From Swiss-Prot:
Any one annotated GO CC term: mitochondrion
Name of the protein this chain belongs to: DNA-directed RNA polymerase subunit beta'
Lineage start: Eukaryota, Viridiplantae, Streptophyta, Embryophyta, Tracheophyta
Entry EC number(s): 2.7.7.6
Main location: plastid
Organism the protein comes from: Gossypium barbadense
Length: 694
C-alpha cells in the first residue's frame, strides 16, 4: 500500500517475477506459503463465502470482516496476547479488512506470455530492441512461426536444419504428430523455439550497452553516406536513422531504470486486490461483478488446461499443446487490453468486456477520475465566462466561491477588528453577508492569488495563478487571451480554484498568467486570439456585406444604409432588427421576341441591389415565413433569351426597381415592385449609360 505521507510520486514500469511474487506471498505459521490463485471460482453458491485459492480467497487477500477469519473466530487486531496472528484451521490472517484493497495475488503461468502493451502498442518496444518486424514477432508469439536454436556441439534431430526456420512451416504439420507431450516438449526445448518463450530468450541474450554501441556505429555510417539522389532510398535511410535513435533511447531508459528487457515477457501474472474488482449483491439476490473477474477466470481456466496437458496427459499431440499456449496468450491479452488484436471479447448481451486498460485510461479511468480529479479543501469549481474588461493577470471570482475560499481569513479579520468575539459569531455574520463582510473579503483578497486549473492538466499552463476580484453571478470570469493555455472555451467549461499557503508562494514566483506568455514546449506565443475573438473581429471588419455578417456599426453599412427601409405611409426611417429582415417576393413576367436582354435589379436610390432571381418558386418554407434568418443573396446580372418567361424575385428591398435593357431596340424598360416610386430622369439616364449592350 502506498503511504501518502512517505511517497510523493508514482512511477509505472515493468517489474521482475520475484517482485510480483513478493507482493503476494505470505508464509503461514505452519510453514505453508499462500498467494497463488489456482482456481477460477469466486464465491460458493450455498455458503456465499469465498472459495479457497480462488479469486476472492480470504487466505490470499485477507478477511472480509476485520478480525474475523473464515471459520468465524474473532481476534482483536493488534493484540499480541490474544494468540497467533493466523487462524490455525483456515489460515486467514487476523487483520483489518481494508487489506483487501491492496493485497495482491498472482497466477503462475504454464508458459511465458508477452505483455501486449510492449508488443502491440506503437512503437513496439520488443520489436525495437530485437530489430525485427512486428508481423514476424506476432507470428512467433502466437505460435505461427518458429526458429532453430543455435546448437553447436549437441547433435541435431534432423540434418536439414533449414526446415526449422520460421519461414518454412512444413514441420508444424509433420514433426509434432510423432511425439507425445513429454517427447515433443523435450524436442522443442532442444531443437526449436516458438511462442513467447522464444521472445524471452532473445531479450535475455541482449546486452543493452553493446546494442547502443552498434546502433551508434550504424547511425554514423548512414550519416556519412549522404544523399544518394534516389528519393526512395533516401527515405529508407531516414527511416532507419530514426529507428536507431528510438532504439538507443529505449535501451538507455532500460539501463537508467534498472529494468531487464526479459521482464516484458510474463511468467507470473499479478491479480488485482478484490476490492478493486468487486462483486456486489443487488436487489432480488442478483450479483453484479466486475468484468475483470470474468477475464481472470478465462485466464485461469486456459492456464489450468495447459498445465494438465503438460503434466498429466502423456498422449497429447504437440500441436495441441501449442494451440493451448496460443489460447493462454490471447486470454492474457484480453485481460490487459481487450480488442487490441482485433475483435474484442463480448459477454452474452453483446457488451464489450472492460479490460485493465479500459479501467485505468480515459476521462473516467482510475487516474483521472479517482486520483487526479479528487476535491481538496479550500477549493471551488464553476463554469467560466469571458471577462474582456479584466487585466491579463486577474480573474473574476463569484462571491459565493470567494467567501468559502477565504472564510478563515475573514473570520480572523472580524475577530481582529472586534466585530465578533469568537469564531461562532463570526461565522454567523458571514452567513448574514453584511457589507462589512465584503469589505474584509476584498481586503484579504488583495494579497492572496488563486490558482485556476482546467482538467485535463496536460501541460504546465493547465494551471495558472491570478489575482482575484469579486464579481456578481456564479461564473468565474476569465480573460480571453489566456484560454489557449488552458485549452478552454466558453461553452460550459468548468475550472477549479485550489488554495493553500504553499500555492501562494509558488504562484507569485512562477505561475502568474502575465509571466507565461510563451509556450514552454515550442516557444510560440500562448496568449493569442482564438475562437470567439477571431470570429468577432471578422464580423466587425467585414466590408459591405449582408446577411449574418452585417453590422450596423460598420462604416460601410452605415454609408449605404443597407439595413434601412422606408415606410411610405409616414415617411419615417426605421430599421429592422439586427439578425432578422423581411423577405419580399415578386412574380415577374417578361414578354418579347427571341432576343438577349440584360436584367438589372436596383433599389430606389439607383444602386445595384442584392436579390435572388429564379425561374422556379422556392418551397413554401422559405416564402411563407415573413421573418427568417438573414441569407446571403447574390448580385444578379444575367442574359436570357425570352419569349414569355416567368421569374420570381426574392429581395430584402421593398422598393425594388427592375430595369430591362434589350439589345435590338436599345430601349430601357422598367418595372416596379412595391409602392409606386418615381425615378428621376437623371438617374435613369445614368443607369442607361452605365449598361453595355450585349
Amino acid at each position: 500500500m502506498i503511504d501518502r505521507y512517505k511517497h510523493q510520486q508514482l512511477r509505472i514500469g515493468s517489474v521482475s517475477p520475484q517482485q510480483i511474487s513478493a507482493w503476494a506471498k505470505k508464509i503461514l505459521p505452519n510453514g505453508e506459503t499462500v498467494g497463488e490463485v489456482t482456481k477460477p471460482y469466486t464465491f460458493h453458491y450455498k455458503t456465499n463465502k469465498p472459495e479457497k485459492d480462488g479469486l476472492f480467497c480470504e487466505r490470499i487477500f485477507g478477511p472480509i470482516k476485520s478480525g474475523i477469519c473464515a471459520c468465524g473466530n474473532y481476534r482483536v487486531i493488534g493484540n499480541q496476547k490474544e494468540g497467533p496472528k493466523f487462524c490455525e484451521q483456515c489460515g486467514v490472517e487476523f487483520v483489518d479488512s481494508r487489506i483487501r484493497r491492496y493485497q495482491m495475488g498472482y497466477i503462475r503461468l504454464a508458459c511465458p506470455v508477452t505483455h501486449v502493451w510492449y508488443l502491440k502498442r506503437l512503437p513496439s518496444y520488443i520489436a525495437n530492441l530485437l530489430d525485427k518486424p512486428l508481423k514476424e514477432l506476432e507470428g512467433l508469439v502466437y505460435c505461427d512461426f518458429s526458429f532453430a536454436r543455435p546448437i553447436a556441439k549437441k547433435p541435431t534431430f534432423l540434418r536439414l536444419r533449414g526446415s526449422f526456420e520460421y519461414e518454412i512451416q512444413s514441420w508444424k504439420y509433420s514433426i509434432p504428430l510423432f511425439f507425445t507431450t513429454q517427447g515433443f516438449d523435450t524436442f522443442r526445448s532442444r531443437e526449436i523455439s516458438t511462442g513467447a518463450g522464444a521472445i524471452r530468450e532473445q531479450l535475455a541474450d541482449l546486452d543493452l550497452r553493446i546494442l547502443i554501441d552498434y546502433s551508434v556505429v550504424e547511425w554514423k555510417e548512414l550519416g556519412e553516406e549522404g544523399l544518394t539522389g534516389n528519393e526512395w532510398e533516401d527515405r529508407k535511410i531516414g527511416r532507419r536513422k530514426d529507428f536507431l535513435v528510438r532504439r538507443m533511447e529505449l535501451a538507455k531508459h532500460f539501463i537508467r531504470t534498472n529494468i531487464e528487457p526479459e521482464w516484458m515477457v510474463l511468467c507470473l501474472l499479478p491479480v488485482l486486490p478484490p476490492e478493486l474488482r468487486p462483486i456486489i449483491q443487488i436487489d432480488g439476490g442478483k450479483l453484479m461483478s466486475s468484468d475483470i473477474n470474468e477475464l481472470y477466470r478465462r485466464v485461469i481456466y486456459r492456464n489450468n488446461t495447459l498445465t494438465d496437458l503438460l503434466t498429466t496427459s502423456r498422449s497429447t499431440p504437440g500441436e495441441l499443446v501449442m494451440c493451448q499456449e496460443k489460447l493462454v496468450q490471447e486470454a492474457v491479452d484480453t485481460l490487459l487490453d481487450n480488442g487490441i488484436r482485433g475483435q474484442p471479447m463480448r459477454d452474452g448481451h453483446n457488451k464489450v468486456y472492460k479490460s485493465f486498460s479500459d479501467v485505468i485510461e480515459g476521462k473516467e479511468g482510475r487516474f483521472r477520475e479517482t486520483l487526479l480529479g479528487r476535491r481538496v479543501d479550500y477549493s471551488g469549481r464553476s463554469v467560466i465566462v469571458v471577462g474582456p474588461s479584466l487585466s491579463l493577470h486577474r480573474c473574476g471570482l463569484p462571491r459565493e466561491i470567494a467567501i468559502e475560499l477565504f472564510q478563515t481569513f475573514v473570520i480572523r479579520g472580524l475577530i481582529r477588528q472586534h466585530l465578533a468575539p469568537n469564531i461562532g459569531v463570526a461565522e454567523s455574520k458571514i452567513r448574514e453577508k453584511g457589507p462589512i463582510v465584503w469589505e474584509i473579503l476584498q481586503e484579504v483578497m488583495r494579497g492572496h492569488p488563486v490558482l485556476l486549473n482546467r482538467a485535463p492538466t496536460l501541460h504546465r499552463l493547465g494551471i495558472q495563478a491570478f489575482q482575484p476580484i469579486l464579481v456578481e453571478g456564479r461564473a468565474i470570469c476569465l480573460h480571453p487571451l489566456v484560454c489557449k493555455g488552458f485549452n478552454a472555451d466558453f461553452d460550459g467549461d468548468q475550472m477549479a480554484v485550489p488554495f493553500s499557503l504553499e500555492m501562494q508562494a509558488e504562484a507569485r514566483l512562477l505561475m502568474f498568467s502575465h509571466m507565461n506568455l510563451f509556450s514552454p514546449a515550442i516557444g510560440d506565443p500562448i496568449s493569442i486570439l482564438t475562437q470567439d475573438m477571431l470570429i468577432g473581429l471578422y464580423v466587425l471588419t467585414s466590408g459591405n456585406r449582408r446577411g449574418i455578417c452585417a453590422n450596423r456599426y460598420n462604416p460601410w453599412n452605415l454609408k449605404s444604409y443597407q439595413n434601412q427601409r422606408f415606410d411610405n405611409n409616414n415617411y419615417k426611417s426605421t430599421r429592422e432588427p439586427f439578425f432578422f429582415f423581411l423577405i419580399h417576393v415578386m412574380r415577374l413576367e417578361l414578354m418579347g421576341r427571341k432576343e438577349s436582354i440584360q436584367i438589372v435589379l436596383c433599389d430606389s436610390g439607383g444602386n445595384q441591389s442584392n436579390a435572388l432571381l429564379l425561374q422556379e418558386k422556392l418551397p413554401s418554407k422559405f416564402t411563407m415565413n415573413l421573418r427568417v434568418p438573414i441569407m446571403r443573396f447574390m448580385d444578379i446580372i444575367q442574359q436570357q433569351e425570352v419569349q414569355k418567361k416567368k421569374f420570381f424575385v426574392y429581395t430584402f428591398e421593398p422598393l425594388l426597381v427592375i430595369f430591362l435593357f434589350t439589345e435590338k431596340s436599345k430601349k430601357l424598360y422598367k418595372g416596379f415592385f412595391g409602392p409606386t416610386h418615381m425615378i428621376p430622369n437623371h438617374m435613369v439616364s445614368k443607369l442607361k449609360n452605365s449598361m453595355t449592350p450585349i
